[in-house]
């Protein structure tokens, strides 16, 4: 990996949040501490469409409604499996391409989740439910004329158990919620976007967008973290030292399916790094590139909070309107001017508009405010340009960029029960908002490994 120096080997768990750009809290209260995801049933997620159709209720009703269209809308229940891998397994089972399966969003691996998927209706065997091992169960719901997408999702609902809290003080939680209601919740990209124990995605993404593909492949396979399992760490270390791919395939934990596919590709074509990266699902290739932009967004947002600009609407800011469901309308942004500053500030306060920041891509508009200046400063620090996101070697992974609210546009939070052993909560968030980011303000753990069931 000429020119690339391994980073993760010296990364401590207490440095993870700084590494992925999450370095500020908006609330000033003490955290209740505790851990989440120590058991898979402690973290449950389901989707509600804009039509109000709840994926858990649809799944449990066992009703097929018929309908018309070229797509079959189903609910997929998955257990301890990430959404990209789940879609790949469904595609393999049905002998179709993964890109033909529609998704509203990617759900956490360490969870039980119920999410909508669409599958092309033109093959035999449907509309019958089916299972894949003990991890995936798919139940058809109805035929529809469209492929499901994030635009159709209203909200994600979470039931979460916080175990071993340091404080079981409901008033402390209520005080934090009041503060979040007043100030807003920073809309960071969450820890799982990058990986907590091995935050590799943005590292590989930066190498890809700089056309350093050999190094990108090598980093994906051999960059190890002191926080991952000892077996994974040892195999990656040996790959880095010896590059014995045949041995590594035999020794690699079975869960690391993408690494095995990449190594098999390299054995067949040792210098074809484009082919090697293309064994990864398209959604994952795009996610890897977009993680660079996500990290830049996070670091910019941290600077905005640090300089006390989070709740200030400035001339030059970009804003988007919010629909009656609380969803941000995907339209051309409005730039704040001296003339409309007062009106827009009132609309932001009333949650009818929201300040947005670019998640960089090759067509990103830039706010002409201090927020835009902070974004440009972070990009310069990272050595990344907007044109970098037009990926020459993997054009299918290129990203135009998007606009993301700096605060979570709408949310609801409810404590179901609280005692010395646990705090049970229900949380609703809009698409693309992260439960761990919201819980971070409530928990404020000493160590971010608390978000994967370790420490407290």
Spans of features found by a protein language model:
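Non-catalytic, substrate/partner-engaging modules appended to enzymatic cores
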Residues: 1-456
């Amino acid at each position: 990996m000429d020119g690339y120096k391994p980073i993760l080997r010296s990364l401590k768990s207490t440095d993870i949040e700084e590494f992925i750009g999450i370095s500020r809290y908006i609330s000033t209260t003490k955290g209740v501490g505790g851990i989440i995801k120590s058991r898979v049933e402690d973290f449950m997620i389901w989707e509600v469409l804009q039509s109000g159709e709840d994926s858990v209720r649809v799944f449990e009703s066992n009703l097929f409604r018929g309908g018309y269209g070229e797509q079959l809308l189903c609910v997929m229940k998955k257990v301890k499996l990430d959404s990209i891998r789940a879609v790949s397994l469904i595609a393999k089972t049905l002998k179709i391409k993964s890109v033909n399966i529609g998704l509203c969003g990617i759900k956490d691996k360490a969870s039980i989740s119920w999410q909508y998927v669409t599958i092309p209706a033109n093959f035999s065997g449907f509309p019958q439910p089916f299972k894949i091992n003990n991890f995936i169960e798919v139940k058809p719901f109805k035929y529809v004329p469209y492929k499901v997408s994030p635009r159709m999702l209203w909200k994600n609902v979470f039931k979460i158990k916080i175990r071993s809290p340091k404080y079981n003080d409901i008033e402390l939680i209520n005080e934090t919620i009041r503060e979040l209601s007043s100030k807003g919740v920073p809309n960071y990209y969450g820890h799982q976007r990058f990986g907590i124990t091995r935050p590799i995605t943005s590292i590989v993404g930066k190498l890809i967008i700089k056309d350093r593909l050999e190094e990108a492949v090598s980093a994906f396979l051999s960059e190890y973290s002191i926080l991952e399992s000892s077996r994974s760490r040892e195999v990656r270390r040996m790959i880095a030292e010896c590059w014995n791919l045949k041995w590594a395939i035999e020794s690699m934990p079975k869960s690391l399916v993408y690494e095995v596919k990449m190594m098999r590709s390299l054995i067949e074509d040792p210098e074809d790094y484009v082919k090697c990266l293309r064994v990864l699902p398209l959604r994952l290739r795009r996610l890897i590139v977009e993680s660079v932009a996500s990290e830049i967004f996070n670091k910019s947002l941290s600077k905005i909070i640090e300089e006390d600009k989070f709740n200030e609407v400035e001339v030059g800011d970009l804003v988007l309107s919010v629909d009656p469901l609380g969803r941000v309308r995907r339209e051309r942004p409005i730039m704040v001017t001296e003339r409309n500053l007062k009106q827009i500030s009132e609309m932001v306060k009333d949650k009818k508009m929201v300040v947005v920041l670019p998640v960089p891509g090759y067509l990103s508009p830039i706010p002409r405010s201090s927020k835009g200046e902070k974004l440009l400063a972070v990009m310069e620090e990272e050595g990344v340009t907007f044109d970098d996101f037009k990926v020459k070697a993997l054009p299918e992974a290129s990203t135009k960029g998007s606009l993301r609210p700096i605060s979570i546009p709408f949310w609801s939070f409810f404590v179901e029960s609280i005692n010395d052993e646990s705090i049970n909560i229900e949380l609703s968030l809009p698409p693309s908002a992260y439960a761990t980011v919201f819980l971070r303000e409530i928990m404020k753990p000493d160590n971010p490994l608390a978000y994967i069931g370790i420490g407290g």
